[in-house]
Amino acid sequence: TDDAQHDWLNANVSLYRRMPADLQEALRVMIPEFIGKVRWRGEEGFMITEEMKVCIAAEACIPVLKLRGGMEIYRRFESIEIFPEDLSKVNGRGVAGDANGRRVRLGWRWAKEGMNDGEDGYNLVIHEFAHIIDFASLDGKADGVPQFNSYSETRDWEKFVAQNYEDFQRELGRNNESFDDYGSSNEAEFFACATESFYERGAQFNQEWPESY
């Protein structure tokens, strides 16, 4: 029910608690559609509850809530696979999540941590769905240039990244508190990390990177 959704989101999703009531309501309208279009699969014996689905769906929908097209942006997206913790290890480090355009994989431990704290700049679900938005562009590539509301906005962002990305790589590790320097890995990761920061540390991000914001 809508009341149950509200209670679950209020208890688990910090970004939801910060939203005005009208946006909360608009988000709750999107959630059942998202849940219904996605194939959900628990890995390594992980059991996915309805509450988990609602919370993940909410965070997946937040980035498209105000975009023209809304859920249509996820038209090619198909499935979510959830692991208890890390997906795998790479060079001794755990992989918390990944995305390939049609599928997202999430480590629940890290997804839950990102939901609960809406001000630390870390949000695994939003990060991975920023990649899905990126993949949904006309070229089908995750290259840090998603499809914006208009062609001119898309071109402006493409030019901005082309002109400034080397500066991002140099500066991300220096006195930067608004988002993870993992964003300097490539243009796609910059877009995903910037999207996390836009929602989690908006004021700080705007102060440090006003043009990107």
Identify the function of each model-found stretch.
Residues G42-K53:
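Short, charged early-sequence alpha-helical segments and their helix-coil boundaries
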Residues E78-S79, R102-V104, Y122:
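Generic beta-strand structural signal
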Residues I35, R39, V54-Y74, E85-N116, ...:
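Metalloprotease/metallohydrolase-associated module, dominated by Zn2+-dependent proteases
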Residues L23, M52, G118-Y122, A188:
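Hydrophobic (often cysteine-bearing) scaffold residues that line and stabilize catalytic clefts
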